[in-house]
Every structure is written in structure tokens, then in C-alpha cells.
Amino acid sequence: MIIRSPEPEVKILVDRDPVKTSFEEWARPGHFSRTIAKGPDTTTWIWNLHADAHDFDSHTSDLEEISRKIFSAHFGQLSIIFLWLSGMYFHGARFSNYEAWLSDPTHIGPSAQVVWPIVGQEILNGDVGGGFRGIQITSGFFQIWRASGITSELQLYCTAIGALVFAALMLFAGWFHYHKAAPKLAWFQDVESMLNHHLAGLLGLGSLSWAGHQVHVSLPINQFLNAGVDPKEIPLPHEFILNRDLLAQLYPSFAEGATPFFTLNWSKYAEFLTFRGGLDPVTGGLWLTDIAHHHLAIAILFLIAGHMYKTNWGIGHSLNDILEAHKGPFTGQGHKGLYEILTTSWHAQLSLNLAMLGSLTIVVAHHMYSMPPYPYLATDYGTQLSLFTHHMWIGGFLIVGAAAHAAIFMVRDYDPTTRYNDLLDRVLRHRDAIISHLNWVCIFLGFHSFGLYIHNDTMSALGRPQDMFSDTAIQLQPVFAQWIQNTHTLAPGATAPGATASTSLTWGGGDLVAVGGKVALLPIPLGTADFLVHHIHAFTIHVTVLILLKGVLFARSSRLIPDKANLGFRFPCDGPGRGGTCQVSAWDHVFLGLFWMYNSISVVIFHFSWKMQSDVWGTISDQGVVTHITGGNFAQSSITINGWLRDFLWAQASQVIQSYGSSLSAYGLLFLGAHFVWAFSLMFLFSGRGYWQELIESIVWAHNKLKVAPATQPRALSIVQGRAVGVTHYLLGGIATTWAFFLARIIAVG
């Protein structure tokens, strides 16, 4: 007799019609909170409404309901993303010079916006080449479209309409999965199933379908474009997909179909799945055949990864078991209990995801210029600078967000009674040692990194160049970085025998790729100047980490306020009668961390902008002589603070300051306006609440005199609200100022 284990019952994972659909809620602002729903007595009401509208934790303590709201909101977010994408593609279809750019990407600039003449704004429509007048864009969309095989504005139209359909679909899904079929909590907590689906589905099949698109559509179309064939003559994407003979003309192995795959004769496919390294000399981008190969390989990895976790079949990893077993000799209980944390606290989960995604975004920023993935991206200096800056800012914000949600987790979701001697508990128990050591590191880095600059400024002022730290006097070469560069340069034929060139031209070697007389990429030399500024990077990053980590580790308690957890994530002070306890909440640490994040990223993007203009970007003559935009002045000028002020900020601001009366004048106005927004922030940051309350009361008195006083009492912003408004305008003003400064400069000279 065979004894079988009983078949697992099929679990019903959704509730039907849990929340009725009604528009009545929309007419009641603050319906999620009893106090706010009563309506405004004072102007504080509108601030509380904004602060709490998306704080689902404060609406209910039911984890299932919170999870459903987050899940539904994600579909809304996706809908907005599709809507935005549709707008980008529609602009490409309706207002752009894409087809002209496609025919001559080296002499024609990308533009997808033509300004209407109302009171003279048409001055902004600059001549981007090919007889087209419009605003030069630096988003990189044209390069992506070419890489994906889009050859006409009609195709952009169709894609834009497709994205709108998807936006509507996402909007519907958000409604459906909250009001009609809402998942149960168990579904949100089914980690193994989620991993399998996300790894195999999103990343595995996603990469596989992109690889398929690249092989069947992008590669043949780009091969024709590179050979100078008129885009109108090139067969349409569906013709390549449906007609194998067309592909076989370009890649003969296509005639054999899938036979080489099943007979393990994979080298047959080396025509379109390559491992070359380096850049395509025609377009200055990575070889598209390398990119297709990469996506195929990634797809295989993720498809395997998506079959590793135990679900309905009793085979595979259990995440809980992995975490429970994760104990080292010095880590006590290790990761015991982490599984419960990550399945019951979405803040903890989000914190990890933000930290990893933020780091990844910064990695993307560094790869976009060193391994430019799209055709003609590397020679479009404005786009290169924009993409680097954009990804650095986004990465910085995501990492601060990681600290914010880690602190919210500590305050709202951490239960000290059930956590003993696991890794988190052990970190919390020696937090004083961590923070004081980190503080020492920050002081060391700060004094030494700035000390090197100040030494140079002093020696320069005294006329003693021989006593400066520079490549021509006292050298401080970044020997470790140079060793890494050299190792990568020598890799082809040695540690990477299959590759014909190293992963990036920036590592070294004699290669230079120029397209249409412009430098795409060349080896980037590192010297004393880079050594100095890298230590400023180390300093600013460590200070950011110090502030954020202190906020997380002291979110629940500190010697100053032992019961901090009871006060919540954000509070102004520990009540009246306890002086010196203001601005210690976890929220305030995020607030301060944002300023240092801004410092960190600013130094990075300034370094990048100047270094590339000095040592990489420029033109190449017929004799092969390279002339860089700023003539290689980085190595000698950036080693003093005065050099940064004079030869970078001041010298390169001339384009934005003198932009009036030209097509770049919008950047001049933005530069001015964003400085104003930034200065406006200081009013909120340097002034106390009482000052404004007194002022408001005089103004209210005047209104009462004239019998025009409003029913809703005006109130000064609370301390936290004032700081929030301040930091928002500080960052917005600073980022927009930098944006105007960079773009006016690089569009004028690049």
C-alpha cells in the first residue's frame, strides 16, 4: 500500500468586493482621519492633510489593509509612469526632428519641443541643425529609440498610444485589486512565490524578451542604419520577425534556425551574440551584439534563480531557513527573526530595497559614460552630463529614503521584547562605539582632505608651486586606482581571453574612439587632483552616513531621551520644561542627512563635469590631435579651492550668465530664479516659529479691523513643517541652479 501525503488544498488568496467603490470619499478631504475629516479650524489643517494622506500606517493598524493600499497605489504609480512615457514618445512623434536626427546624428542635435510664439518666447527655438529650430533635449530618448530599432515618427505614435492603453490598464488594476479582488495578507507574505515570479518573470522573461527584440529587430535595423541606408528603405520590424530570410542575409546562421541551439553548436550564433568589449567605432556606443548577448546571459541566470525557492512543490530553498542558519562565530543569533521583520514591516522591506536601488542607480550613473550603451550617446555631451547628474541625484535621494524608512521601522515596527542577540540587537547594543568611531573618521577625513587643499591654496598664494601637492611637485598619485585601471586594461587576452577589448576605454591603453570629429571616449588619466577630490567624496559620504545612521540607531531611545520611541518618528521637542531636546527626532536626522547628501552629490557632479571637459570631451583633428573643451586644466587648477571657484564655477558660469538674448536664455532665467528659490528656503531654515506667529497675529489684527478676517485661523508653520518647507526649497533651488549652469555651459561649448 502506498501512503501519499495529502494534496495541499488550493488556498483562496483574495477577498471578493472588500471595499465598495464610492466617490463620496473624494468629497471629504481627510476622510482617513477623524480629526482631519472634521475640516479646518486653523491653517495647520492643510499641512496635516498633506502629511498624513499617504501615511497608511496612521489610517489603520490592520496590516492587511495597509498592504492592499500600498499594492493598489503601486498600480497608480505605474499608470503615471506609462502616462509620462507616452508623453515622451508622443513628443518624439509630433514635435521632434527624430527622423532628421536619425539620418545625421553627428551634425543634428536632438529636439522634441518647439516653443509657441506668444510674447517672444520663440527665441528659445535654437538651430539644432538640419534646418530645424527647437529646444535641444538631453534626455537620451533619441539614442534609446535608435538602439531599439525605431525608424519613423509613426512608430513613436503607435508606441505612445500603446503606453496610454497600458496606463489605463494599470489604473483599472489598481481599482480592481483594492475594490473587487483584494489579496489576503498571506499572499503579500508569500516570499518564495514572490521571489520566483519576480526573478523568473520580471527579470528573466523580461531580459529574454528584450534580448529577442534586440536580435530580431534592433540588430538588423541598426546594421542598416550604420551602413548609411535611408531609414525609409529599411524593412519594418514585423518583416524581420516574420521573414527569416531577411535576417539570414545579414546573419547567415539564422538560416539554420534553432538547430545549433539544440545540438549544442552554440558558436554558430557568434555572429550576433558577441563578446567584443570596447565601443563600436561607427556609433561610439557599446556593440549592440554584445548587449544582446548580455541580456540573453542575464535572462538565463534569472530564469534559473527564479526556480530556486520552495513553493507548492516541496523542493527548493526556504528563505526563513536560510536566514535562521545565517550565523557567524561573532554574530550571536545572526539573522534569526529577520524573516518575521521583513514580512510584517513594509518599512524594513522598503528600507533595504531603497538602499540597494539607490546604490544601483549610482552604479548606473558611472556606467552610462564609461560604457555608453546607446548609439551616438557618447558624443552628445549634454545628454552624457544630464544622465550622470540625474542618476547621481536619484541615487542620493533613494539612499536617504532608505535611512528614513529604517528609522520609521525602528519607531513603529521594531519590537525589542522579541529580539535578543540577533544582528540588529547586537548593533543597537554597541551603537555608541559605532557612532563615535564614525564621528572620528569624519573628523579625520574632513581635516585631512580640506587640509591638503588649504595647504595648496596657501603655497599658491605665497608663490611656492614647488611646495604644492600636484602632479608636477609633491605627487600624491592614486596608486590603487591606477593599479585597478591597469589590471582591466591588460584583461583582454589575459584574464578575459575571449574579449578583444577591455570593458571600458576609460581603463587605459592607447585606444580612442571619435565619431564625426568628436571624442566619444578615451582612457581617463587619474592623478593628484583626483586623489584630492576623492578624499572630499569620502568625507562627505561618511558625514551623510554618520547623520543617517545615528538617526536610525537612536530612533527609539538615547541617553538624552530614553523614551524617544513613544514620541514617534517626528516631533519638535520632548515637551515643555526639557530644554535642549529639540530637533532630535528620527525625522530631523533625515532632514539633516538631506543637506549632506546634497553636498556629496554636488561635489561628485562638479568633479565629473570638469574632469570630462578637461580630459575626455573635445574635438579631434584630421592629424589625430585632440583638443579638449577646457584644455586639460583639471590637473593643475582643481588642486586649490581657489581653482575650483575661479576656473570651474566662475569660468564655466559665463555661458549661463551671458545667455540672455540667445536660445539658451531660459537657462539664464532658471539660474536666477532657482537661486531665488534657494534663498527663499533660508527664510524657513534660519527663523523661529514664534517670529512668524507674532507677525501673523499683527496681520490678523489688521484684517479684523477691516472686517475681512477669514473663518480659518492663520497659524505659523510648526517647527517640523517649517524645516520641511525649508529643505524642499533648498534642494529644489540648488538642483535647478546646477541644472541651468550645467546645460547652458555644455550646450554652448559641447
Swiss-Prot record:
Coiled coil: none annotated. The lineage of its organism: Eukaryota, Viridiplantae, Streptophyta, Embryophyta, Tracheophyta. SUPFAM superfamilies: Photosystem I subunits PsaA/PsaB. This is Photosystem I P700 chlorophyll a apoprotein A1. GO terms for molecular function: 4 iron, 4 sulfur cluster binding; chlorophyll binding; electron transfer activity; magnesium ion binding; oxidoreductase activity. P700 is a chlorophyll a/chlorophyll a' dimer, A0 is one or more chlorophyll a, A1 is one or both phylloquinones and FX is a shared 4Fe-4S iron-sulfur center. The keyword Plastid applies. The PsaA/B heterodimer binds the P700 chlorophyll special pair and subsequent electron acceptors. PSI consists of a core antenna complex that captures photons, and an electron transfer chain that converts photonic excitation into a charge separation. The eukaryotic PSI reaction center is composed of at least 11 subunits. It comes from Gossypium barbadense. It catalyses: reduced [plastocyanin] + hnu + oxidized [2Fe-2S]-[ferredoxin] = oxidized [plastocyanin] + reduced [2Fe-2S]-[ferredoxin]. The keyword Thylakoid applies.
